[in-house]
Amino acid sequence: MADQTISNVLNQPQWRCLESKIEKSTLHYGRFIISPLWKGQANTIGLALRRTLLSEVEGTCITSVKIKNAIHEYSSLSGVQESVHDILINLKKIILSSSFSGIFEGFLSVVGPKTVLASDLNLPSFIKIVNPDQYIATVNKPINFNLQIYIQKGKGYSLKNPISIKQGFFLVDPVFIPIRSVNYSIHSFEDEKATKEFLIVEVWTNGSIEPKEAIKEASYNLVNLFTPLVSQEYQQLKNQLFKEDEKNKELNFIETNSNAISDNENSYNLYNQIFLDQLELSSRAYNSLKKNNINTISDLLKYSYEDLLKIKNFGKKSADQVIEQLKKRFKIQL
């Protein structure tokens, strides 16, 4: 029993960090593995995770700025080397990190002559500047140089911000994407006569979030996306079956869910939500079953071994494969 429990745990997909390093303050790298996976699952997870990392992970940016004495975006400021447009571009390059959502205010007030850097900004204590050496402007005369900025957390691209319509404020055109790049690769291996896969994911961030945390956030977003699609009844059934499996009991849908299913319902209804592709049959066997309107495990359980042999183009080899997969995956003896 203990050996079987250990085997069940080892067969559950698990994440592990293979490598983590800081190449520079604005470039953090992480390499991860998830294994074991059934054939085809690695590509499904890799594609969904990559797209979610690049579009759904939140970032913190300066969204708008008010510059004293600035008339319009392409105007020049007396005593300042850069135009307003150049200052906005430099502010956009500042990388911020914050665990709080909302709109926050920051200030900058210096007296020239001075080279103005991101480290000269006065921000709330919970907002960290990842690249404090980021250049903003050069004040080449003994004048006051003042900025008022707004900071916000968001996802993806923001081309419009209500704050920017206030008089004297300029939109910084922020990009709320802390992920610089994502790569994934799929590798196969043999396990107990079955071909399985493992997924390698590489993540580069701008330093405002660690790759490991980005993976977690993207995974949570995917879970939250699919959760509403799962009915309450099916979720309860899944939870009950998981508990039974952890106790190393036979995977018997009827017995483990007797309290959730009325007496007049037959056992096949429990398998209506499990489709044939979960058995990973050969193309010939799968197509033959589909042609005979056998789409779910529930449909399949209506057939005996002898009945399967009577199906056109469904030979003994295919029937034996069905028997083996039902027993292996669902502990069902047809």
Swiss-Prot record:
Keyword Cell membrane among record annotations: no
A Pfam family assignment: RNA_pol_A_bac
Superkingdom of origin organism: Eukaryota
Catalytic activity annotation: RNA(n) + a ribonucleoside 5'-triphosphate = RNA(n+1) + diphosphate
Signal peptide: none
InterPro entries: DNA-dir_RNA_pol_insert, DNA-dir_RNA_pol_RpoA/D/Rpb3, DNA-dir_RpoA, RBP11-like, RNAP_asu_C, RNApol_insert_sf
Keyword vocabulary terms for this entry: Chloroplast, DNA-directed RNA polymerase, Nucleotidyltransferase, Plastid, Transcription, Transferase
SMART domains linked: RPOLD
Principal location class: plastid
Localization annotation: Plastid, Chloroplast
Class in the EC hierarchy, top level: transferase
Keyword Nuclease among record annotations: no
One biological process term in Gene Ontology: DNA-templated transcription
Domain notes: The N-terminal domain is essential for RNAP assembly and basal transcription, whereas the C-terminal domain is involved in interaction with transcriptional regulators and with upstream promoter elements.
Protein family (similarity comment): Belongs to the RNA polymerase alpha chain family.
Record function comment: DNA-dependent RNA polymerase catalyzes the transcription of DNA into RNA using the four ribonucleoside triphosphates as substrates.
Name used for this protein in its record: DNA-directed RNA polymerase subunit alpha
Gene symbol of the encoding locus: rpoA
